[in-house]
Curated annotation (Swiss-Prot):
Compartments it resides in: Cytoplasm
Function: Catalyzes the condensation of (S)-aspartate-beta-semialdehyde [(S)-ASA] and pyruvate to 4-hydroxy-tetrahydrodipicolinate (HTPA).
Pathway entry: Amino-acid biosynthesis; L-lysine biosynthesis via DAP pathway; (S)-tetrahydrodipicolinate from L-aspartate: step 3/4
Positions annotated as active site in the UniProt record: 133 (proton donor/acceptor), 161 (schiff-base intermediate with substrate)
Enzyme Commission code: 4.3.3.7
GO molecular function per UniProt: 4-hydroxy-tetrahydrodipicolinate synthase activity
Pfam family membership, one: DHDPS
Sequence similarity: Belongs to the DapA family.
Keyword flag Amino-acid biosynthesis: yes
Organism phylogeny: Bacteria, Pseudomonadati, Pseudomonadota, Gammaproteobacteria, Pseudomonadales
Species, as recorded: Pseudomonas putida (strain W619)
Protein name: 4-hydroxy-tetrahydrodipicolinate synthase
Positions bearing the site annotation: Part of a proton relay during catalysis: 44, 107
């Protein structure tokens, strides 16, 4: 079962924007050694928007091979074109992914019926577990709870990453779906509360730099130990906040360089973290106990 702390993995690059396979392997090993429950490759944090289709497949294949079945590998395969999303999802299945994460179509702003038909078509076209991903702050399109509940009965659609941070919405989804449908947070600050409501885990940016702590948080919350889970969350709150001082994944990539886990590299139109944010991120790493 897919549950717990699922890292939204960055895609390491060099100064010229070329994929850095050595650092990617190091990051996968870092998560395997520190209790991460699943890896989400080539999602938003993995800069999927600026990877070619060939690179997309190569990253999934690399991560699947490195993980070697020890934890699930989930591939980001969403697109604002239904046919492209089918193509990416089939590629991810062929590359060995355990499941796919499909973001709500961005820019073209489909209706709720359009969203239903989009995700239903992909689920019927490719036989692989699929997780919906609602993040209206990035897509400018908000999938309502009623649409999620409707999609929850479609074969191959197994869950949703709900990244709004709206706990009332999360509860409405949880109340309307079967117990087998996985509701996950995509918002680090509120993830603990969503899990305590009945969610199954968190697809996390913070887990890139604090995998052990995020795994402990999710495990405590899944066990119903609210006091322990909230205490860990409070310690991680500086990271939850300051890893978004600029657009994700800019700050978290800077943090990983500071930790010695990868080299400096990002693709335009994203740029490296501005100097005014450097100390914010370093301070958050120290306050959360990641750096001393």
């Amino acid at each position: 079962m897919i549950a717990g702390s699922m890292v939204a993995l960055v895609t390491p690059m060099d100064a010229q924007g070329r994929l850095d396979w050595g650092s990617l392997g190091k990051l996968v090993d870092f998560h395997l050694e520190n209790g991460t429950h699943a890896i989400v490759a080539v999602g938003t944090t993995g800069e999927s928007a600026t990877l070619s289709v060939e690179e997309h497949i190569e990253v999934i294949e690399f991560v699947v091979k490195r993980v070697a079945g020890r934890i699930p590998v989930i591939a980001g395969t969403g697109a604002n074109s239904t046919s492209e999303a089918v193509h990416l999802t089939q590629n991810a299945k062929d590359a060995g992914a355990d499941a796919c994460l499909l973001v709500v179509p961005y820019y073209n702003k489909p209706t709720q019926e359009g969203l239903y038909l989009h995700f239903k078509h992909i689920a019927e076209a490719v036989d692989i577990p699929q997780i919906l991903y609602n993040v209206p702050g990035r897509t400018s399109c908000d999938m309502q709870a009623e649409t999620v509940i409707r999609l929850s009965t479609v074969p191959n659609i197994i869950g949703i990453k709900e990244a709004t941070g709206d706990l009332a919405r999360a509860k409405a989804i949880l109340d309307g779906v079967s117990k087998d449908f996985i509701v996950m947070s995509g918002d680090d600050p509120t993830a603990v509360e969503l899990i305590l409501l009945g969610g199954k885990g968190n697809i996390s940016v913070t887990a890139n730099v604090a995998p052990r702590e995020m795994a402990d948080l999710c495990e405590a919350a899944l066990e119903g130990n609210a006091e322990k889970a909230r205490a860990i969350n409070e310690k991680l709150m500086p990271l939850h906040k300051d890893l978004f001082c600029e657009a994700n994944p800019i700050p978290v990539k800077y943090a990983l360089v500071e930790m010695g886990l990868m080299q400096k590299g990002i693709r335009l139109p994203l740029t490296w973290l501005s100097e005014g944010c450097h100390e914010k991120v370093r301070t958050a790493l120290r306050q959360s106990g990641v750096l001393v």
